[in-house]
Amino acid sequence: VREHFPEGLSAESLSRAPIIEFDRHDMFQQRFIGRITRVRIDPPRHFIPSSAEFAAAIELGMGWGMLPEAQSAEGIAAGRLAELTPSRSLKLPLYWQRWNLHSPVLDALSQIVEEEGKAALEA
């Protein structure tokens, strides 16, 4: 934050600061930029297609990116991560995908994953 956003967030600072993205389909950071600036910008980017390594790249200062609260809370508390907009957040829909098979075991597992995921994310 000190290096890339010393004057705060703006279209200019966001256009220069490197983004960490999961892959070429990851539009979460672009969605955040759009909400902040209302313009389309194309900053430099690094693709890190691993959840743990994605977070590590942000902690190492390779760039900025959006992390779930559960994944970022410890780093924020320890001072290794900083919130760019502490009073604002973005919600991202999550999907549980499975084979389209009739299976009581998969049906039960899907229900458990949905219930536990919802409880964990709304806590």
Predicted segments, located by residue:
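Small-molecule pocket liners
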Residues: 1-3, 17, 92-96
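Short helix-loop capping/hinge motifs at secondary-structure junctions, enriched
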Residues: 1-10, 27, 101-107
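Short secondary-structure boundary/capping segments
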Residues: 10-12, 36-38, 73, 86
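Secondary-structure junction motif
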Residues: 16-38
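Structural signal for conserved beta-strand scaffold positions within catalytic alpha/beta enzyme cores
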Residues: 21, 47, 83-85, 98
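Hydrophobic hinge/microswitch elements
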Residues: 39-83
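A late-sequence structural motif
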Residues: 86-123
